UniProtKB/Swiss-Prot annotation:
Its cofactor is FMN. Keywords: Flavoprotein, FMN, NAD, NADP, Oxidoreductase. CDD domains: RutE-like. It is an enzyme of class 1 (oxidoreductase). Belongs to the nitroreductase family. HadB/RutE subfamily. This is Putative NADH dehydrogenase/NAD(P)H nitroreductase XOO4023. HAMAP family: Oxidoreductase_RutE_HadB. SUPFAM superfamilies: FMN-dependent nitroreductase-like (SSF55469). Its EC number is 1.-.-.-. GO terms for molecular function: oxidoreductase activity. It comes from Xanthomonas oryzae pv. oryzae (strain MAFF 311018).
Length: 196
């Protein structure tokens, strides 16, 4: 492992990064979004399964399809964000394991009813969604993750007839500090962790 990141990098990723509720009217190019995925894909998942699937909603048509699924409190900021990422997971992710994990017959570990692998798809897809937030920050983007939406409506609008299920949404862009809430506290180490 290489040396630790410097304090400025750690601030950008964690300490001074904020969940954004408003964004500048500055587009995010497809090239930047492709670069973002090229970072995300290297984050670890069980058996290198990579079950996450990402839809980068940037068009007016895409936002119009997303709008009916949004909760009232999340609609305006999501429709105004340059990018809304639907972080989803493929419940048939195991079909790609012969390519992604050639060291063993990993596909056979997940054969059987889809329900049996849904938990792994959700868990590892959630990990990849977290990597997306950190990768976005590393590239100078701001993120606003949220779960206030109707998953069934998103799935019907974007994933109908597929084994892909939505998990959460992340608005991306260049944050407008005017939309920030005051910084909320976090639990201390002793409140959230322990040694055994």
């Amino acid at each position: 492992m290489s040396d630790s990141l410097n304090a400025a990098a750690l601030d950008q990723l964690f300490r001074t990064a904020r969940t954004q509720n408003a964004f500048a009217d500055t587009p995010v190019s497809q090239e930047v979004l492709r670069e973002l995925y090229e970072l995300v894909k290297w984050g670890p998942t069980a058996a290198n399964s990579g079950p996450a699937r990402f839809v980068f909603v940037t068009s007016a048509d895409g936002k119009a399809r997303l709008k009916p699924a949004l909760s009232e409190g999340n609609a305006a900021k999501t429709l105004a964000a340059p990018v809304t990422v639907i972080v989803a997971h493929d419940e048939d992710f195991h079909e790609k394991l012969p390519y992604l994990f050639p060291h063993a017959d990993a596909k056979s570990w997940f054969d059987g009813p889809r329900e049996g692998r849904a938990e792994s798809a959700f868990r590892n897809g959630s990990l990849q969604g977290a990597y997306l937030i950190l990768a976005a920050r590393a590239l100078g983007l701001d993120a606003g993750p949220m779960s206030g939406f109707d998953n069934a409506k998103v799935d019907a609008a974007f994933f109908a007839g597929t084994p892909i299920k939505s998990n959460f949404l992340v608005n991306l862009g260049y944050g407008d500090p005017a939309g920030l809430f005051p910084r909320s506290p976090r639990l201390s180490f002793d409140e959230a962790a322990r040694f055994e």
